[in-house]
Amino acid sequence: MAIKTKTIRRKKIPFLQRIYLPFIFAGMARTFRHFFRNLKDSSNIDFLEYPEQKPTDITNRYRGLHRLTKNEKGDLKCVACDMCATACPANCIFITATEIEGSKEKAPSKFTIDLLECVFCGLCVEACPKDAIRMDTGIFTKVGNTRESFLADIKTLSQREEGSF
């Protein structure tokens, strides 16, 4: 029993396409063309000296730092269902639940968000059934010297207010 083989001939790719150099030079030529055009006439370039000047064209749907909302009594709306932590693709939300005395509901005893891991996708906000977590603080920058300063705990999250954009 002989094995039958079939020889397949591939189309030859032209030399210039194989080395990609023409495409690299074309891209660089376009970049330099824009660079020198803007260098010659910089009147149409808008500059924003942040943080002295704040952007004015931010929409209300822009996601800032997180906050935990409260109900009419002043208690946190969060029932520690862990749905926000489950929905988070970066696994940056950590919740420890505790039971409320005289009630079947739970409340978070610890609620921590690692802002260095967070990708600010907003899936935690969409997953929350009680509308307990929001990203509408209007705070878009966070500055710190240590990794611990980027851990937002339950106290920090509950003190943040809804911001003005």
Swiss-Prot record:
Keyword check for Membrane: yes
Keyword flag Cell membrane: yes
Annotated coiled-coil segments of the chain: none
First-listed, main subcellular location of the protein, grouped into a coarse class: membrane
Start and end residues of each 4Fe-4S ferredoxin-type domain: 66-98, 109-138
Names of the cofactor(s): [4Fe-4S] cluster
Cofactor binding description: Binds 2 [4Fe-4S] clusters per subunit.
Binding site for [4Fe-4S] cluster 1: 78, 81, 84, 128
Source domain of life: Bacteria
Key words of the record: 4Fe-4S, Cell inner membrane, Cell membrane, Iron, Iron-sulfur, Membrane, Metal-binding, NAD, Quinone, Repeat, Translocase, Ubiquinone
InterPro entries: 4Fe4S_Fe-S-bd, 4Fe4S_Fe_S_CS, NADH_quinone_OxRdtase_chainI
Pfam families: Fer4_7
Membrane topology reported for the UniProt record: Peripheral membrane protein
Family classification: Belongs to the complex I 23 kDa subunit family.
Assembly and oligomerization: NDH-1 is composed of 14 different subunits. Subunits NuoA, H, J, K, L, M, N constitute the membrane sector of the complex.
Name of the molecule in the record: NADH-quinone oxidoreductase subunit I
Organism: Campylobacter fetus subsp. fetus (strain 82-40)
